[in-house]
From Swiss-Prot:
Species of the source: Ruegeria sp. (strain TM1040) (Silicibacter sp.)
Protein name, UniProt field: Protein NrdI
Role this protein plays: Probably involved in ribonucleotide reductase function.
Alphabetized GO MF terms: FMN binding
Disulfide bonds: none
Top-level taxon in the UniProt lineage: Bacteria
Gene symbol of the encoding locus: nrdI
Family statement drawn from the similarity comment of this UniProt entry: Belongs to the NrdI family.
GO biological process: protein modification process
UniProt-listed PANTHER family: PROTEIN NRDI
Length: 140
């Protein structure tokens, strides 16, 4: 089971963050067909937005989420961005969370810091434990 799916642009910030995070993850391709997932996952995405907030969600992420199966298995989103862009910092996470009715679990800047990595690891462990407990309760 891959519990993380991510997209990283040519800047590589999200890819560097994911490498340092050290957890199994599926990378979305920039141009090839989108994969289809078969288990619940958390999406990690950068933010691409103009000064007005348009275009915040990268096109490969939109393409991936337009697959109803992929969208149904999404459990949360982690978003990256650049604080220099003010209100649009990590906006992709807010857009996806609202459209897909999932929580924004974390926001990070650029390639993240060591503190971000530690918080994400701990937060994801708690999140998946809670998801597992919820699944067990609904199956009982």
């Amino acid at each position: 089971m891959v519990g993380l799916v991510y997209y990283s642009s040519r800047s590589g910030n999200t890819a560097r963050l994911m490498e340092r995070l050290g957890l199994e993850a599926l990378r979305l391709p920039q141009t090839e067909p989108s994969p289809e997932v078969d288990a619940p996952y958390v999406l990690v995405t950068p933010t691409f937005a103009d000064g007005e907030g348009r275009g915040a969600v990268p096109k490969p992420v939109i393409k991936f989420l337009n697959n109803s199966r992929n969208r149904a298995l999404l459990r949360g989103v982690i978003a990256g961005g650049n604080r220099n862009f003010g209100d649009t910092f990590a906006l992709a996470g807010d857009v996806i969370a609202k459209k897909c009715n999932v929580p924004v679990l974390y926001r990070f800047e650029l390639a993240g810091t060591e503190t971000d990595i530690a918080r994400m690891r701990a937060g994801l462990a708690r999140f998946w434990a809670a998801q597992e407990q919820q699944t067990c309760l609904t199956q009982a």
